[in-house]
C-alpha cells in the first residue's frame, strides 16, 4: 500500500526537524546568527519536487520574478536591460521576503529576491541562493540626540532595556543630571530569518518589554524622527528615501567607530550590522530554466553597477575582503 504524498511529506519534515534540532539549538545560544547552514533543505515530498513553475501573471511571460522592496528598485533596471537584450518577457513583482518565499514554495516564481539571509525553512529542495551583496543596517536616533558613535554592546543594551536612560550611556553627550528616557523602536520583520535586526538581539524575547514595535519601514523612521530619546534601525536607502518623500529626518550613528556609509568598513567586517541581499534560481528538475540561470549570472556580474543610492556592497567586493561563499551564496563573515 502506497503512503499518501501529504503524509509522507509530513513524516519527512518531522525527521528533518529532529536531525537539525541540536545544531539549531546550539546556534540559538550564541545569539545573533548571521547565516544558516546551506547544506540543509526542508523536505517537500516527491510530488512537489516533480512540479514545474506555474506562472500566475496576467499575460504569458518567459520568467516570473518576485523581489523584496529594496531589491525591486535596485534590480529592475538591470532586469529590463537583460530582457531587451535577449528578447524575452520578464514579469517582476514588488513584494517582501515573505511574498518571495510564498511564491517559491508554491512553485509560482522562477526567481525570488530577499533582503535577508535564508531561514532553514526557505531552503527548498532544488533552490539555490545567489548573493547580490550586503547593505548596512544603520542605527538611528532623533536629530536632537548628541551621540555620534556607539559600541555595539551598548546598542544591544538600549534595545534590551538594560540601559533605560541616555545619561547612563558613557560618552553619550548628555550633561550630568540631564535625563532622557530611551525609547527603543523595533521592526521585527522576518523573524525566522537570520541576520538583519537579529544581529542586534537574536530574538524578539531579548528586546525590552517597553519597546515600541512598528510594522512598516516608514513608521520606523517617522517614529524616530518625531520622538526625543528614540533609537531604531533601517537601511540607508530607506532612510534617505523617506527623508526625501516624507521629510522624516533622523541621525545616523557610527557603530564601534565605523560609519554605516563607509563601504570599506562594511566590506572589511568592521561595521557589524547589515542585511544580505539574495536572489534564487532552481538548480534542476522541472522548475529549472536556463534563462533563469542566465539572468542570475547577469545580475551578479552587474551588481557593481547598481546605483550607489541603494548602498549595496556587491558580492565581488565581499569575496575580495575574505567573506565566505558556497558557490554564489554568502555563508559567513570574514575571519
Segments the model singles out, each with a brief description of its role:
Residues 8-19:
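Bacterial N-terminal signal peptides
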Residues 24-335:
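Flexible loop/hinge segments at secondary-structure junctions
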Residues 1-4:
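N-terminal secretory signal peptides that target proteins for export/translocation
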